[in-house]
Amino acid sequence: MSKIIGIDLGTTNSAVAVLEGTESKIIANPEGNRTTPSVVSFKNGEIIVGDAAKRQAVTNPDTVISIKSKMGTSEKVSANGKDYTPQEISAMILQYLKGYAEDYLGEKVEKAVITVPAYFNDAQRQATKDAGKIAGLEVERIVNEPTAAALAYGMDKTDKDEKILVFDLGGGTFDVSILELGDGVFDVLATAGDNKLGGDDFDQKIIDYLVEEFKKENGIDLSQDKMALQRLKDAAEKAKKDLSGVTQTQISLPFITAGAAGPLHLEVSLTRAKFDDLTRDLVERTKVPVRRALSDAGLSLSEIDEVILVGGSTRIPAVVEAVKAETGKEPNKSVNPDEVVAMGAAIQGGVITGDVKDVVLLDVTPLSLGIETMGGVFTKLIERNTTIPTSKSQVFSTAADNQPAVDIHVLQGERPMAADNKTLGRFQLTDIPAAPRGIPQIEVTFDIDKNGIVSVKAKDLGTQKEQHIVIKSNDGLSEEEIERMMKDAEANAEADAKRKEEVDLKNEVDQAIFTTEKTIKETEGKGFDTERDAAQAALDELKAAQESGNADDMKAKLEALNEKAQALAVKIYEQAAAAQQAAQGAEGAQSSDSANNDDVVDGEFTEK
């Protein structure tokens, strides 16, 4: 069975891992980094992903960041003169990760396990699956990020029974999961979270502070200047990271804008104490899900054996202190918070292929599922933190006499009224025989698969007629749209490969020209003029082909030059070998003369 890669598709950074033997290994990107910025930019018709895209974010308005926060919505982003869905942008990131994983493995990759925040709803999970499909990946499993982290943490501890709390604060989302580990079983007891809380919010607090300080001093609102705002975003992210290691940092942004008197510069000193003060409310927000998860799991803090920190934002000192204060435990630092989720996803890939034995993952649904009933009430069929996959049925009836059809309004959430929860979909069961209200028996069944994706069916127990739907969010993509996007992604991949081939050829030509010119210059006046002249002629032809830009011509002329340069190199080698032989011969002769004189002794004599 081919390899299944593990992907952590993050808000700010993503990572890809693969199972090698029984070890999960992070695959470095082409720039040598173990995580890749989840950034996509468009320039001159080219799609740029990762570090290169992030570097040009300040100057390129066609740059998309933090697209994960829009997954599962109908919101589109405009770039490159076109509107893109969150699934399309996410697919570009996935395609890039897939590409360099293939380069590392030396084989095609078609299957992946992709992680999502535990608190992602059905629409967001479906959108993630669609993004994988557009990128040319068969998504074998959607795994919750804290669960994947626990899998990576606990793989070498399968003989140990312990309860762990995973505190996962990433770039855009926050999750807390409580798991019980023992005998290779990873059992999620409860999960809670906040999909609108992450490192981006901490950055925004710094940005708002800088905008306010600059406005006080100069009377100019930098939040209205798109380019200045991007520079502020970069500076805020850097300052946040700096303050994890030092207690004060200097934010310097020269020429941030221009005033009546000329260019203006931003210079602000930010202390860790001030940063903690600015972000106090965000840190406070992490405490509620921790308490809720413990309550849902029916555990007290004393029963938790380990606290695992996941996500780059858990490096913020105030966050670490809050975790210590809330749990009464020193967090376990045995895992890399940026890499552990992708590593866990790769392990789950190994479970699917059979390379990892005796590991069972029991995950849960993060939110309750149900339908709208009379009076706009939300009636739950599946409670949150129910182990998945699962199925649950309940019998309902009609609300009016001779009602010919029932509308099934499917919802996800925790609020008592339907209007306050997330609509997953609607469908209708028709042709119900005329009968007084309360008589028809309508059985509604919810199914949640291992990926947390929901399907619902309604069945009239009297006629056995049933209606069935797999929930597709109103904001989701149709099969036709996914198909079109897959074709676009494939076309982009071909175009990218062609561009890479052109760049490789250009580099090869430049290198050949440089090397040959150097050789011709160094061999001037040393003989073998025939070979030198032939190499020079081939060199001139290659330069002309380079000027024309014709790839086929360049390839042919490069081959010809390599042939002539090889002939010249052979002559140089032969001359060098002959010279060395001659030198060795001379040394041998000298040694021989010396040996012949070894027994000769000078003496004096006198005639008598």
Curated annotation (Swiss-Prot):
Residues 599-608 have a biased composition (Acidic residues). Residues 576-598 have a biased composition (Low complexity). Keywords: ATP-binding, Chaperone, Nucleotide-binding, Phosphoprotein, Stress response. Residues 576-608 are annotated as: Disordered. One of its GO terms (molecular function) is ATP binding. Belongs to the heat shock protein 70 family. NCBIfam families: PRK00290.1 (NF001413), prok_dnaK (TIGR02350). This is Chaperone protein DnaK. It comes from Streptococcus uberis (strain ATCC BAA-854 / 0140J). The lineage of its organism: Bacteria, Bacillati, Bacillota, Bacilli, Lactobacillales. The gene is dnaK.
